[in-house]
Amino acid sequence: MSLYESVQNQIKESFVFISNEYSDDLLQRVLRPDRVMEFHIPVKMDDGTTKVFAAYRSQHNNAKGPYKGGLRFHQNVSKDEVMSLSAWMSLKTSVVGIPLGGGKGGIIVDPKLLSKGELERLSRGFAAKLTPFIGKEVDVPAPDVNTTGEIMAWMVDEYSKLVGVWTPGVITGKPLSIGGSQGREKATSLGGCFTIDEYFKNSGQSLAGKTIAIQGAGNVGLNFATLIVHNYGAKVVAISDSRGGIYNPDGLDVDQIEKLKSENKSVSEYSNASQISNDDLLLLNVDILVPSALEQVIHADNADKIQAKVILELANGPVTPQADKILTSKNIPVLPDVLANAGGVTVSYFEQVQNNTNYYRPESEVNEKLEAIMRPATLAAIQTAEKYNTTLRNGAYIVSLRRILEAMKVRG
């Protein structure tokens, strides 16, 4: 089964609960992207040769607003992947109630093999190819895997040159100096904190003292670790990166880990902890397991061994559909990616609004507005799951699908 087929199955499974409210015709439209584009970008390399790179942009659904979603530069980018991620983006923007749709794109490339000049020429070439199909009220890309604020700056500059007017709102995730938003760097992590805190609050519990294992010490995982410890009093007992992980049941010093990562060192160089593999970290007996790096890390072969009391999906698609069913049978709730990591796109939306109104907000105000969106969205997913006696994933999907389908229905 392809990744997109599994996304379609997830949507169909949730639609069953509201099939008496909306026609199957509307469902069929949501099951397919509005448009998927393939591009070929010629780039003059430093040695004088020209290399052609394949790229994609999937525009899934814009019933509620402009397509929105990242651009990734990775050797494994595929049409199936961007279609799947664009559908998740539609669900993500809808579940938090922001007026955007879903899109995703990428280039098949390993950016580590390019010089900075080659990377800039590739980025500008992609922007030129995308220009007829994007715009601040049409489709608004953003950073994703292996893309940075600097790359977004090159792309918004190229787009603006081609259309003849400076248009910062066409792309988000930009550097602050050209219209980026305060709070964007930590938005996904902070949104995840609000989500898991609201989950425990709903059952009369606090995060204080809760044990947490985090797979992934990149921007999202590391920021989540520091925020959840310092703001909520939780205890991070394990964390990993691509080179391995560390575990200390008494808790880890997240500030020391942050310092290690800032020096481009591995968390495995942390002294006061046992070494642990990425695979074994997932199986620890903790209160909260946070996959924040790779897709499909919890699958049919390891789901039955998961001991965490709840899973917070800060990565996209870290739990396979088969694993989902096993976790449900074990009564392990999963706060799904479309909700749990929606803080990033929410602050990207704030960036769009700030660009388009030319009024910029301080970080404290951005964070307050993010909290005001994430907490009610989490509560709505929990209450919907309880109403229909189903999983939190279905609860979030039902909330999201209902909003998309209603917008499509009233638009005709």
Descriptions of predicted regions:
Residues S2, S6-N9, E21, V77-D80, ...:
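Conserved active-site and cofactor/substrate-binding residues in soluble primary-metabolism enzymes
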Residues E38-P111:
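Glycine-rich, N-terminal phosphate-binding loop and its surrounding beta-alpha-beta segment
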Residues K174-P175, G180-V286:
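Glycine-rich phosphate/diphosphate-binding loop of Rossmann-like nucleotide-binding domains
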Residues G244-V334:
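Rossmann-like adenosine-cofactor binding region
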Residues S2, Y199, A308-G412:
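Adenosine-phosphate binding glycine-rich loop
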Residues S2-H40:
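Short, Gly/Pro- and small/polar-rich lid/capping loops
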